[in-house]
Amino acid sequence: MRKKILFFAMMLLLLTGITASADVLGEQNGGWSTYMGAFTYFHNVQFNSDSVGKQNEYYVEYTPNEDAVPIVVNGASIWGTRNIKQAEQYMQENGLRPLVGINADYFSFKTGIPMGYTIADGEIISKEYGGQDAVGFRSDGTGFIKWLDIQTTVTDGEKSIDVMYINKWCQAGFDPVYLLTDKFGETTKTQSECIFVICTPNEGRLHVDETMSLTVDDVFIYNGEIEIPEGKVVLLMDTSGVSEYYDFLSRLHAGQTLTVANQAVGDDGTWKTTENAVSSVGGRLVTNGVANSDFEAGAAPRTAVGIKADGNIIFYTLDGRQSGYSYGAQLKTLAKRMVELGCVDALNLDGGGSTTISAWFPGKDNTMVVNSPSDGYLRSVANYIFLKDNRERTNIPWIINITGETNNNYLSGMTANINIESVYDTANYKMEEPYNIKYRAETDTDSTVDENGAVSLNGTGDVKVV
């Protein structure tokens, strides 16, 4: 008599239906969902549309918790770009464990500098002039989307001037004052005659609604780029810039104390609570549950982030520009889709060839890029939003990867072997042997399984080994 042996461990793939309506992208005709741990689910949904054909979206729904928290990752410097695998490598080299990542802000292809605001680990590491919509994340994992406009000033105790940009490129002929830290890069990248003020930070930090005290080390004029000393702050401007600003900087001297202040214009204190944030020139997709529609036309791959009414956060990507696989979407369509997913607020991030999502799935040794970037390769971009995995080893088995003869038919009297290839604990760390796995055969037959996973098959019917 034939019988079938089935092996069941804690299964990774959840073949549950996607509950949100998906009419805006077409009729759902496939997909999958995976529980990542840390209150995080990864979804793929496949659609077919009569008007544009196939669509493939990949998104994560995250319930805020401290086992995994959203952070913004730039890499070693603001200047330059890196692809998502390089960003993950940077994280791991610095003791950070990525769970899920998506690309974030628009950026200059020439310099790699993001076009908006970036706050990382409680510090403003890139500031634009004027306001933009932005997403902020607190240390407990909660998030919000709100207008962000930071006014930065530097004062010598008597007079103050505006600092328009933090860690942006000071180009020849530009008027304003810039502030650079060693996070900008190794040098200032300046190409004209500038006045430089080298300072040592004393107290405080570059954060919203906070001040930082500086001591002036040196003031000088130089034509070209200079090194940014580690741990120092550099105030600079083109010597042909605004005379009021130039006069202020030129009067400074070594030993003088300065105060840098950053204030969120028109804010109610919300931005002071954030530890990580990124803005976007791509604009707001959803405001108070209503999809915005005032967008330029044109379908493309898309990346977005949204906040649901219950506080859950959606990290969203939609592939595009790939005939027969995924068409992409217009921004007004993306906005409607974010509403379908339950978002009350949503922000459009850099899309097109930049759209990328990666994940470290349970039972795997490293991350993998899940979507299909439209360039055909991983584009290097300015920065990313990652879920940083804070979980520590538990040594409690969760995912069991096996080899051997499973889900096959056998004759009574035969023996089948189940071999464990690897075991991952409930925090998705690979466990070392011995695994202390115990087998049990659930069956109406006389079949048995021993402590080594050898199944003796007797009788007729299915054998489930758990």
What residues fall within each predicted segment?
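Sec-dependent N-terminal signal peptides of Gram-positive bacterial secreted proteins and lipoproteins
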Residues: 4-22
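Zymogen propeptides
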Residues: 21-236
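Conserved, well-ordered active-site substructure
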Residues: 48, 109-137, 275-343, 354-404
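Solvent-exposed loop/turn segments at secondary-structure junctions
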Residues: 66-67, 105-109, 142-143, 151-152, ...
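Short alpha-helix capping/helix-loop boundary micro-motifs
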Residues: 235-250
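Loop/turn positions that initiate beta-strands
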Residues: 252-259
